[in-house]
Regions:
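Short, small/polar residue-rich loop motifs at catalytic or cofactor-binding pockets
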Residues: 23-29
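Surface-exposed patches in mature extracellular/periplasmic domains of secreted proteins
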Residues: 17-21
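Conserved "boundary/linchpin" sites in short secondary-structure elements
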Residues: 7-14, 33-48, 57-71, 76-96
């Protein structure tokens, strides 16, 4: 399920990665609280800054744009009440 959520968020992260940044060097971690239908409750909570304020802002904006989160493909699965998601500017840029 996490992969489908990240696939929803990543295309909405608009950030130009500065030269010399390596994978794993700058990671932002957010917690998102969810309703059973995947709708976000409240704002994403930043648990860890990447150290790149513009990237952190781009990630938070992208999380908000992906609302509601996709439903699980397995109809019997439930949406978690809370998710912790890690973002990396190099990884996110490689997949856009």
């Amino acid at each position: 399920y996490a992969a489908s959520v990240i696939a929803c968020i990543r295309p909405n992260i608009f950030y130009a990665v500065p030269p010399g940044i390596e994978r794993g060097q700058h990671q932002a971690v957010y917690r998102v609280n969810l309703l059973p239908n995947g709708e976000q409750t409240g704002n994403p909570v930043q648990l860890k800054s990447s150290g790149l304020p513009a990237y952190d802002h781009a990630v938070e904006t992208a999380i908000r744009r992906c609302n509601p989160f996709p439903r699980p493909k397995d109809q019997s699965a439930t949406v978690p009440r809370s998710m912790q998601i890690t973002f990396d500017p190099v990884e996110d840029n490689a997949n856009n």
